[in-house]
């Protein structure tokens, strides 16, 4: 990036001035080393700038990570309750803590892996639908939820896959509707 003169600093309102030497005590004429940096993300094509969507890789990482984290926390909570219920009358405090930690760790890992896989499948189906239709709306999420439920229960038979698909579609629709309600009525 070339250095800019002082005369054209106010010409573009979508930029900010940046001085790379502002934090250093160096004997350099700082006014000639002011650079105009954009304040918004840069895109090669204007169509990319109009889309407010994560890429398929970011989508995959986000949904899988969020699902794994949520499943691990929920599983650890259930594991704590299971560990507390498994106390015996002669257990020492050290043994009780050990039971709680073992139970919460095992259940947290199991739930995290299972729900993380569901997030992975959902993200893959949703990204595939968006790539095929070039649309991202409520129905994309509902169809992705339907497909995720069906894929995750396909090994148990057609009836189980159909029920799980319907539940997945309803769950995805409820989440999207809740997100829209929060955007509209909750001032953030």
Curated annotation (Swiss-Prot):
GO terms for biological process: protein import into mitochondrial matrix. InterPro entries: Tim23 (IPR005681), Tim23-like (IPR045238). The keyword Membrane applies. Pfam families: Tim17. It comes from the Eukaryota. The keyword Flavoprotein does not apply. The chain crosses the membrane at residues 64-84, 112-131, 138-154, 161-178. The C-terminal part (143-188) is required for insertion in the mitochondrial inner membrane. Belongs to the Tim17/Tim22/Tim23 family. Essential component of the TIM17:23 complex, a complex that mediates the translocation of transit peptide-containing proteins across the mitochondrial inner membrane. Links the inner and outer membranes. This is Mitochondrial import inner membrane translocase subunit TIM23-2. It comes from Arabidopsis thaliana.
